[in-house]
Amino acid sequence: MFAGKRLLAALFTATLVLFGVNAGVSAQAAPEVCAGAFQGDNRLGPETLPKPTQQPVGPLVAGYKRFGDLGKDAFLAKYWNGTGWNYPPQDGFWLKPDGAPIKYKRTLQKNTRLDRFGSEFGGFLAHKGAHYSTRAIPPQSLYTFDPAYRCNYHAYQVTKAFAVWEGPIAPWFEQSGGGLQQKLDRALVPGDGALNVAWLLSNGYLVRIN
């Protein structure tokens, strides 16, 4: 009888140990979102993208194809000039038949939520939650340069109203575009020095909500 109890206890302990080991292996095997560089080249974005259910970036890249329907080499030949990306004309706004950008001045009111893929030294924003393909930006903008901001993603809330140029985004980088972008312009916001997201943060116009 006692031998049987000892055998059951040993089996129970072995099961717990095995389960714990397997759970640890599974946890270690789960990749971090937007980790590494695709094929060792950060221009191509991260090796691993979040699943559609992984907030906050997963839903924004669901179905995303980093090269569109092109191969890697054709994509780079079209959009990489040797020292940087070939960005679209007129700051990426959709163009009228005469080549003028479709944009208008808009005041972003307090509590408006915005985001961007890229460093805080940039001058473009979008409404929070816009799909990545509608932004028509390169795959490199998803690369994790700062581990504190996976997928290079930053989210903000307006704390003091300010004006921007807003308008529809033209297709580029083999992405559909069609979203709305907000372009910062020093002429629209009083102050000194270069106007970028970092300036808006330090001057009380935005707060981070990551």
Where are the regions that the model predicts?
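ADP-ribosyltransferase catalytic core
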Residues: S119-G123, G129-Q175
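Generic detector of low-complexity/intrinsically disordered segments
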Residues: A9-A14, L18-G20, P46, K51, ...
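Secretory pathway export signals and precursors
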Residues: A29-A30, P147
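Active-site or metal-binding loop neighborhoods of secreted/extracellular toxin and effector enzymes
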Residues: A163-N210
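ADP-ribose/NAD+-binding catalytic cleft of ART/PARP-like enzymes
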Residues: P31-G123, H131-S133, Y153
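Secretory targeting and sorting signals
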Residues: M1-A29
